[in-house]
Regions:
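Nucleotide-activated sugar donor-binding and catalytic core shared by glycosyltransferases
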Residues: 1-243, 253-391
Length: 391
Protein backbone atom coordinates (compact mmCIF):
# COMPACT_ATOMS: atom_id res chain seq x y z
CA UNK A 1 0.00 0.00 0.00
CA UNK A 2 1.39 3.41 -0.99
CA UNK A 3 2.35 5.79 1.77
CA UNK A 4 1.91 9.48 0.98
CA UNK A 5 2.32 10.66 4.57
CA UNK A 6 5.59 12.42 3.69
CA UNK A 7 3.89 14.50 0.97
CA UNK A 8 2.38 17.79 2.04
CA UNK A 9 1.59 21.28 0.85
CA UNK A 10 3.64 24.22 2.10
CA UNK A 11 0.58 25.59 3.90
CA UNK A 12 1.59 29.14 3.02
CA UNK A 13 -1.93 30.51 3.07
CA UNK A 14 -2.45 30.06 -0.67
CA UNK A 15 -5.02 27.83 -2.37
CA UNK A 16 -3.75 24.24 -2.34
CA UNK A 17 -3.92 22.86 -5.88
CA UNK A 18 -3.19 19.29 -6.97
CA UNK A 19 -2.38 18.91 -10.68
CA UNK A 20 -2.42 15.34 -12.02
CA UNK A 21 -0.69 14.27 -15.25
CA UNK A 22 0.40 10.97 -16.75
CA UNK A 23 1.31 11.42 -20.41
CA UNK A 24 3.46 13.53 -22.69
CA UNK A 25 0.56 15.55 -24.23
CA UNK A 26 -0.68 16.57 -20.77
CA UNK A 27 2.77 17.77 -19.73
CA UNK A 28 3.24 19.78 -22.93
CA UNK A 29 -0.18 21.43 -22.91
CA UNK A 30 -0.09 22.17 -19.19
CA UNK A 31 3.48 23.50 -19.08
CA UNK A 32 2.62 27.21 -18.97
CA UNK A 33 -0.34 26.56 -16.66
CA UNK A 34 1.80 24.57 -14.21
CA UNK A 35 4.43 27.30 -14.06
CA UNK A 36 1.79 30.04 -13.68
CA UNK A 37 -0.16 28.24 -10.95
CA UNK A 38 3.06 27.70 -8.98
CA UNK A 39 3.39 31.50 -8.78
CA UNK A 40 -0.02 32.03 -7.19
CA UNK A 41 -1.05 28.75 -5.56
CA UNK A 42 0.46 26.12 -3.28
CA UNK A 43 0.90 23.40 -5.92
CA UNK A 44 1.66 19.69 -5.87
CA UNK A 45 2.21 18.08 -9.28
CA UNK A 46 1.53 14.34 -9.33
CA UNK A 47 2.50 11.98 -12.16
CA UNK A 48 0.52 8.74 -12.30
CA UNK A 49 3.28 6.89 -14.13
CA UNK A 50 0.82 5.99 -16.91
CA UNK A 51 3.28 6.74 -19.68
CA UNK A 52 6.69 7.34 -18.16
CA UNK A 53 10.17 7.06 -19.60
CA UNK A 54 12.64 9.83 -20.34
CA UNK A 55 11.87 10.10 -24.07
CA UNK A 56 8.12 10.14 -23.52
CA UNK A 57 7.98 12.41 -20.47
CA UNK A 58 11.27 13.30 -18.81
CA UNK A 59 12.73 15.21 -21.75
CA UNK A 60 9.74 17.54 -21.72
CA UNK A 61 10.23 18.54 -18.09
CA UNK A 62 13.73 19.58 -19.14
CA UNK A 63 12.77 21.27 -22.43
CA UNK A 64 9.85 23.17 -20.92
CA UNK A 65 11.71 24.16 -17.74
CA UNK A 66 9.29 22.38 -15.44
CA UNK A 67 10.17 21.31 -11.93
CA UNK A 68 9.96 17.56 -11.44
CA UNK A 69 6.66 16.25 -10.04
CA UNK A 70 6.44 16.11 -6.28
CA UNK A 71 4.75 12.70 -6.54
CA UNK A 72 5.16 9.63 -8.76
CA UNK A 73 2.33 7.17 -8.21
CA UNK A 74 3.81 4.25 -10.22
CA UNK A 75 0.26 3.23 -11.08
CA UNK A 76 1.06 1.13 -14.16
CA UNK A 77 -0.38 -2.37 -13.80
CA UNK A 78 -0.09 -5.65 -15.64
CA UNK A 79 -2.85 -4.64 -18.05
CA UNK A 80 -5.04 -1.66 -18.91
CA UNK A 81 -7.74 -2.57 -16.41
CA UNK A 82 -5.26 -2.82 -13.56
CA UNK A 83 -3.61 0.46 -14.58
CA UNK A 84 -6.92 2.34 -14.59
CA UNK A 85 -7.83 0.83 -11.23
CA UNK A 86 -4.44 1.76 -9.79
CA UNK A 87 -4.75 5.34 -11.02
CA UNK A 88 -8.11 5.75 -9.30
CA UNK A 89 -6.92 4.01 -6.13
CA UNK A 90 -3.53 5.74 -5.84
CA UNK A 91 -4.88 9.20 -6.59
CA UNK A 92 -7.62 8.68 -3.99
CA UNK A 93 -5.00 7.77 -1.36
CA UNK A 94 -2.89 10.78 -2.31
CA UNK A 95 -5.82 13.20 -2.13
CA UNK A 96 -7.01 11.77 1.17
CA UNK A 97 -3.51 12.26 2.57
CA UNK A 98 -2.74 15.79 1.34
CA UNK A 99 -6.29 17.22 1.24
CA UNK A 100 -6.03 19.68 -1.66
CA UNK A 101 -8.45 22.57 -2.03
CA UNK A 102 -8.87 21.82 -5.74
CA UNK A 103 -7.76 19.35 -8.43
CA UNK A 104 -6.82 20.22 -12.02
CA UNK A 105 -6.67 17.75 -14.92
CA UNK A 106 -6.48 18.15 -18.68
CA UNK A 107 -7.89 16.04 -21.47
CA UNK A 108 -9.07 12.47 -21.83
CA UNK A 109 -6.28 10.18 -20.60
CA UNK A 110 -6.48 7.34 -18.11
CA UNK A 111 -4.84 9.68 -15.60
CA UNK A 112 -7.88 11.96 -15.78
CA UNK A 113 -9.91 9.17 -14.19
CA UNK A 114 -8.33 10.34 -10.93
CA UNK A 115 -11.24 12.78 -10.74
CA UNK A 116 -13.42 9.88 -9.57
CA UNK A 117 -11.57 9.89 -6.26
CA UNK A 118 -11.73 13.68 -6.03
CA UNK A 119 -15.50 13.56 -6.46
CA UNK A 120 -15.85 11.00 -3.70
CA UNK A 121 -13.73 13.18 -1.41
CA UNK A 122 -15.76 16.33 -2.21
CA UNK A 123 -12.78 18.16 -3.74
CA UNK A 124 -13.61 20.75 -6.45
CA UNK A 125 -12.52 19.47 -9.87
CA UNK A 126 -11.36 21.71 -12.73
CA UNK A 127 -11.10 20.13 -16.19
CA UNK A 128 -9.24 21.70 -19.11
CA UNK A 129 -9.90 20.58 -22.71
CA UNK A 130 -13.47 19.86 -21.68
CA UNK A 131 -16.22 19.25 -24.21
CA UNK A 132 -14.05 17.85 -27.00
CA UNK A 133 -16.02 15.30 -29.02
CA UNK A 134 -15.19 13.43 -32.22
CA UNK A 135 -18.41 11.36 -32.18
CA UNK A 136 -16.45 8.14 -32.82
CA UNK A 137 -17.37 5.58 -30.18
CA UNK A 138 -14.48 3.32 -31.25
CA UNK A 139 -12.06 5.69 -29.55
CA UNK A 140 -11.46 5.01 -25.84
CA UNK A 141 -10.83 8.73 -25.34
CA UNK A 142 -14.43 9.52 -26.28
CA UNK A 143 -15.76 7.57 -23.30
CA UNK A 144 -13.29 9.16 -20.90
CA UNK A 145 -14.17 12.64 -22.18
CA UNK A 146 -17.78 12.14 -21.20
CA UNK A 147 -16.89 10.65 -17.82
CA UNK A 148 -14.49 13.44 -16.87
CA UNK A 149 -16.73 16.24 -18.19
CA UNK A 150 -19.70 15.01 -16.17
CA UNK A 151 -17.74 14.44 -12.96
CA UNK A 152 -15.92 17.79 -13.11
CA UNK A 153 -17.32 20.80 -11.27
CA UNK A 154 -15.90 23.44 -13.62
CA UNK A 155 -15.23 22.68 -17.28
CA UNK A 156 -12.82 24.79 -19.32
CA UNK A 157 -13.33 24.32 -23.06
CA UNK A 158 -11.07 25.28 -25.95
CA UNK A 159 -13.84 26.53 -28.23
CA UNK A 160 -17.50 27.42 -28.62
CA UNK A 161 -18.00 24.07 -30.37
CA UNK A 162 -16.86 22.32 -27.18
CA UNK A 163 -18.96 24.59 -24.97
CA UNK A 164 -22.06 23.70 -27.01
CA UNK A 165 -21.34 19.99 -26.62
CA UNK A 166 -21.15 20.49 -22.86
CA UNK A 167 -24.40 22.47 -22.83
CA UNK A 168 -26.11 19.76 -24.88
CA UNK A 169 -25.05 17.26 -22.22
CA UNK A 170 -26.94 19.29 -19.64
CA UNK A 171 -23.91 20.49 -17.69
CA UNK A 172 -24.30 23.82 -15.86
CA UNK A 173 -23.58 26.72 -18.20
CA UNK A 174 -22.58 28.92 -15.29
CA UNK A 175 -19.61 26.63 -14.59
CA UNK A 176 -18.42 26.24 -18.18
CA UNK A 177 -15.86 28.61 -19.70
CA UNK A 178 -14.04 28.93 -23.02
CA UNK A 179 -10.39 29.50 -22.19
CA UNK A 180 -8.85 28.59 -25.54
CA UNK A 181 -6.02 26.12 -26.01
CA UNK A 182 -2.94 26.40 -23.77
CA UNK A 183 -0.63 25.30 -26.61
CA UNK A 184 0.00 28.77 -28.08
CA UNK A 185 1.33 30.05 -24.77
CA UNK A 186 3.74 27.11 -24.53
CA UNK A 187 4.85 27.50 -28.15
CA UNK A 188 5.32 31.28 -27.84
CA UNK A 189 7.47 30.84 -24.76
CA UNK A 190 9.66 28.35 -26.62
CA UNK A 191 9.63 29.77 -30.15
CA UNK A 192 13.21 31.07 -30.11
CA UNK A 193 14.51 27.69 -28.94
CA UNK A 194 12.39 25.92 -31.56
CA UNK A 195 13.76 28.12 -34.34
CA UNK A 196 17.33 27.67 -33.04
CA UNK A 197 17.20 23.85 -32.92
CA UNK A 198 19.98 22.14 -34.91
CA UNK A 199 17.95 18.96 -35.39
CA UNK A 200 18.23 19.10 -39.20
CA UNK A 201 22.00 19.14 -39.02
CA UNK A 202 22.04 16.32 -36.47
CA UNK A 203 19.76 14.12 -38.57
CA UNK A 204 21.19 15.09 -41.96
CA UNK A 205 17.84 16.37 -43.24
CA UNK A 206 17.32 19.23 -45.68
CA UNK A 207 14.58 21.69 -44.82
CA UNK A 208 11.49 21.25 -46.97
CA UNK A 209 12.66 17.90 -48.32
CA UNK A 210 11.33 15.39 -45.82
CA UNK A 211 7.95 14.28 -44.49
CA UNK A 212 7.45 14.21 -40.73
CA UNK A 213 5.32 11.30 -39.54
CA UNK A 214 3.73 10.63 -36.16
CA UNK A 215 1.43 7.61 -35.81
CA UNK A 216 0.68 6.19 -32.38
CA UNK A 217 -3.07 6.18 -31.73
CA UNK A 218 -4.64 2.98 -30.49
CA UNK A 219 -7.10 2.76 -33.38
CA UNK A 220 -4.27 3.02 -35.92
CA UNK A 221 -1.72 0.75 -34.24
CA UNK A 222 -3.64 -1.93 -32.34
CA UNK A 223 -6.33 -2.76 -34.92
CA UNK A 224 -4.83 -5.16 -37.48
CA UNK A 225 -6.79 -3.91 -40.48
CA UNK A 226 -6.07 -0.26 -39.74
CA UNK A 227 -2.40 -0.95 -38.97
CA UNK A 228 -1.85 -2.69 -42.30
CA UNK A 229 -3.80 -0.04 -44.23
CA UNK A 230 -1.89 2.83 -42.62
CA UNK A 231 1.63 1.52 -43.10
CA UNK A 232 0.87 0.31 -46.62
CA UNK A 233 -0.23 3.89 -47.32
CA UNK A 234 2.99 5.23 -45.75
CA UNK A 235 5.07 3.00 -48.02
CA UNK A 236 3.12 4.34 -51.01
CA UNK A 237 3.84 7.86 -49.78
CA UNK A 238 7.58 7.11 -49.59
CA UNK A 239 7.53 5.71 -53.11
CA UNK A 240 5.59 8.63 -54.60
CA UNK A 241 7.51 11.51 -53.03
CA UNK A 242 10.91 9.80 -52.92
CA UNK A 243 12.15 11.66 -49.87
CA UNK A 244 12.93 10.70 -46.27
CA UNK A 245 9.94 10.10 -44.02
CA UNK A 246 11.07 10.72 -40.46
CA UNK A 247 8.86 8.66 -38.17
CA UNK A 248 8.84 9.88 -34.56
CA UNK A 249 8.04 6.44 -33.25
CA UNK A 250 6.34 5.75 -29.92
CA UNK A 251 7.74 2.62 -28.17
CA UNK A 252 4.35 0.89 -28.50
CA UNK A 253 4.30 1.58 -32.23
CA UNK A 254 7.87 0.31 -32.64
CA UNK A 255 7.02 -2.87 -30.74
CA UNK A 256 3.92 -3.41 -32.88
CA UNK A 257 5.95 -3.00 -36.09
CA UNK A 258 8.56 -5.47 -34.86
CA UNK A 259 5.96 -8.04 -33.84
CA UNK A 260 4.06 -7.75 -37.12
CA UNK A 261 7.10 -8.19 -39.35
CA UNK A 262 5.75 -5.42 -41.58
CA UNK A 263 8.53 -4.18 -43.86
CA UNK A 264 8.71 -0.41 -44.10
CA UNK A 265 10.12 1.30 -47.18
CA UNK A 266 13.81 2.09 -46.67
CA UNK A 267 13.00 5.81 -46.91
CA UNK A 268 10.93 5.58 -43.71
CA UNK A 269 13.33 6.34 -40.85
CA UNK A 270 12.18 5.27 -37.39
CA UNK A 271 13.41 7.60 -34.65
CA UNK A 272 12.81 7.58 -30.92
CA UNK A 273 10.32 10.25 -29.76
CA UNK A 274 11.83 13.69 -30.20
CA UNK A 275 12.07 16.54 -27.71
CA UNK A 276 9.68 19.49 -27.83
CA UNK A 277 12.00 21.99 -29.53
CA UNK A 278 13.36 19.51 -32.06
CA UNK A 279 9.97 18.10 -33.05
CA UNK A 280 8.40 21.51 -33.59
CA UNK A 281 11.40 22.72 -35.57
CA UNK A 282 10.96 19.68 -37.81
CA UNK A 283 7.24 20.40 -38.14
CA UNK A 284 7.60 23.99 -39.30
CA UNK A 285 10.23 23.05 -41.92
CA UNK A 286 8.68 19.84 -43.29
CA UNK A 287 7.49 19.22 -46.83
CA UNK A 288 4.40 17.91 -45.05
CA UNK A 289 3.45 16.76 -41.56
CA UNK A 290 1.40 13.55 -41.47
CA UNK A 291 0.18 12.82 -37.97
CA UNK A 292 -2.59 11.33 -35.84
CA UNK A 293 -1.73 13.65 -32.95
CA UNK A 294 -4.58 15.55 -31.36
CA UNK A 295 -2.47 18.70 -31.16
CA UNK A 296 -1.71 18.85 -34.91
CA UNK A 297 -4.53 21.35 -35.64
CA UNK A 298 -3.40 23.58 -32.77
CA UNK A 299 0.24 23.51 -33.84
CA UNK A 300 -0.66 24.16 -37.48
CA UNK A 301 -2.80 27.14 -36.46
CA UNK A 302 -0.07 28.56 -34.22
CA UNK A 303 2.76 28.26 -36.74
CA UNK A 304 0.58 29.86 -39.41
CA UNK A 305 0.01 32.78 -37.04
CA UNK A 306 3.76 33.36 -36.58
CA UNK A 307 4.74 33.03 -40.23
CA UNK A 308 5.83 29.38 -40.29
CA UNK A 309 2.91 27.59 -42.00
CA UNK A 310 3.30 23.92 -42.86
CA UNK A 311 1.06 21.45 -44.73
CA UNK A 312 -0.79 19.46 -42.07
CA UNK A 313 -2.49 16.13 -42.81
CA UNK A 314 -4.25 14.16 -40.08
CA UNK A 315 -4.38 10.37 -40.47
CA UNK A 316 -7.74 10.00 -38.79
CA UNK A 317 -11.36 9.93 -39.97
CA UNK A 318 -12.74 12.11 -37.17
CA UNK A 319 -11.68 15.14 -35.17
CA UNK A 320 -12.55 16.64 -31.80
CA UNK A 321 -11.33 20.02 -33.07
CA UNK A 322 -13.85 21.04 -35.76
CA UNK A 323 -12.97 24.70 -35.20
CA UNK A 324 -9.64 23.99 -36.93
CA UNK A 325 -11.43 22.72 -40.03
CA UNK A 326 -13.64 25.81 -39.84
CA UNK A 327 -10.46 27.83 -40.46
CA UNK A 328 -8.82 25.38 -42.93
CA UNK A 329 -5.85 24.61 -40.67
CA UNK A 330 -5.48 20.95 -41.65
CA UNK A 331 -6.89 18.11 -43.75
CA UNK A 332 -8.47 14.89 -42.48
CA UNK A 333 -7.08 12.11 -44.66
CA UNK A 334 -7.92 8.80 -43.05
CA UNK A 335 -5.54 5.88 -43.54
CA UNK A 336 -6.42 4.69 -47.05
CA UNK A 337 -3.47 4.99 -49.44
CA UNK A 338 -5.17 6.87 -52.28
CA UNK A 339 -6.95 9.28 -49.95
CA UNK A 340 -3.76 9.96 -48.01
CA UNK A 341 -1.75 10.72 -51.14
CA UNK A 342 -4.49 13.02 -52.44
CA UNK A 343 -4.60 14.84 -49.10
CA UNK A 344 -0.82 15.35 -49.05
CA UNK A 345 -0.91 16.66 -52.62
CA UNK A 346 -3.67 19.15 -51.79
CA UNK A 347 -2.08 20.29 -48.51
CA UNK A 348 1.35 20.83 -50.10
CA UNK A 349 -0.01 22.63 -53.16
CA UNK A 350 -2.26 24.91 -51.09
CA UNK A 351 0.66 25.79 -48.81
CA UNK A 352 2.84 26.50 -51.84
CA UNK A 353 0.14 28.76 -53.32
CA UNK A 354 -0.33 30.72 -50.11
CA UNK A 355 -3.79 29.26 -49.40
CA UNK A 356 -2.91 28.80 -45.77
CA UNK A 357 -6.17 28.95 -43.92
CA UNK A 358 -6.55 31.21 -40.90
CA UNK A 359 -5.35 30.80 -37.32
CA UNK A 360 -8.10 29.66 -34.97
CA UNK A 361 -8.63 32.57 -32.53
CA UNK A 362 -8.96 30.18 -29.58
CA UNK A 363 -5.66 28.54 -30.56
CA UNK A 364 -3.52 31.67 -30.46
CA UNK A 365 -4.51 33.09 -27.06
CA UNK A 366 -1.41 33.83 -24.99
CA UNK A 367 -3.05 34.27 -21.58
CA UNK A 368 -4.78 30.93 -21.06
CA UNK A 369 -2.78 30.30 -17.90
CA UNK A 370 -4.05 33.60 -16.46
CA UNK A 371 -7.62 32.54 -17.17
CA UNK A 372 -7.10 29.17 -15.51
CA UNK A 373 -5.62 30.73 -12.35
CA UNK A 374 -8.51 33.17 -11.99
CA UNK A 375 -11.19 30.56 -12.70
CA UNK A 376 -9.76 28.18 -10.09
CA UNK A 377 -9.43 30.98 -7.53
CA UNK A 378 -12.97 32.18 -8.29
CA UNK A 379 -14.80 28.87 -8.29
CA UNK A 380 -13.19 26.71 -5.63
CA UNK A 381 -15.25 28.45 -2.97
CA UNK A 382 -18.36 28.51 -5.15
CA UNK A 383 -18.22 24.75 -5.70
CA UNK A 384 -17.67 24.12 -2.00
CA UNK A 385 -20.72 26.23 -1.18
CA UNK A 386 -23.13 25.36 -4.00
CA UNK A 387 -22.21 21.70 -4.64
CA UNK A 388 -20.86 20.37 -1.36
CA UNK A 389 -22.66 22.77 1.05
CA UNK A 390 -19.47 23.08 3.10
CA UNK A 391 -20.44 26.55 4.32
Amino acid sequence: MSDYSSISFKNNGKLKLLIIVGTRPEIIRLAAVINKTRKYFDVILAHTGQNYDYNLNGVFFHDLQLADPEVYMNAVGADLGETMGNIISESYKLMAAIQPDAVLVLGDTNSCLSVIGAKRLHIPIFHMEAGNRCKDECLPEETKRRIVDIISDVNMAYSEHARRYLADTGLPKERTYVTGSPMAEVLHQNLEKIEASDIHQRLGLEKGKYILLSAHREENIDTEKNFTSLFTAINKMAEKYDMPILYSCHPRSRKRLEQSGFKLDKRVIQHEPLGFHDYNCLQMNAFCVVSDSGTLPEESSFFTSVGHPFPAVCIRTSTERPEALDKACFILAGIDGDHLLQAVDVAVEMNRNGDLGLPVPNYVDENVSDKVVKIIQSYTGVVNKMVWRKY
